[in-house]
Amino acid sequence: MIKVHHPEIDQEELLKAAGRIVTLVEKENHIKEASSSAVTEELLRDNMPDDDHFMVHLIAMGDGENYGQNRNGDYWPKEANQKYHNTFVTKGHFFREHNNRDPEKALGIVKASAHNDDMSRIELVIHGDKKKAEEEYELAKQGKALSFSMSARVPYDVCNVCGNKATKSANYCEHLKGRMNQYVPEFQKFAYAINDKPTFFDISRVVNPAD
């Protein structure tokens, strides 16, 4: 199964806590401002791009324990985010609008990832090709807001209400099939799907995140 998640829309509290989701790091004097406790000044300095690329530090997603499930009913546990965030680097690319079928058409790469334990979130360092991602680069230089969304493959998900494990939505239990994100009074909880084994393969700039 493929899951899509947009932090600004799906986890509004994450945006409130962070203040800013995306930061362009173009010069040496931007490094301190763009760093965090997870994506440190040293990490940014070690990953400065060549002249043909630009670098962005962004927040990809937050842990479910702190920020809840998203509007699709997907819950991303802290333990899974800690364990699998590096798949953004090993399997992922920087795309536009989730056109992620062909890595050759990617706008760039994910250079580094980190789990910020203090802030309960995954942070990424991406390099964009200044020609392929010219639009994104120009907007970032102008200080315009850029929205990002991620995609992940999961071998299954688990209903938090009854524990049913499904490899496809056709095998969902009654809670996820008809009551996703709804309160289930007999269990005194909201129904959502736990994704505890994600492979993150796509971080995309999206124009209309709410679509």
Please describe what each predicted stretch is:
Residues 1-211:
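Signature of dsDNA virion morphogenesis modules
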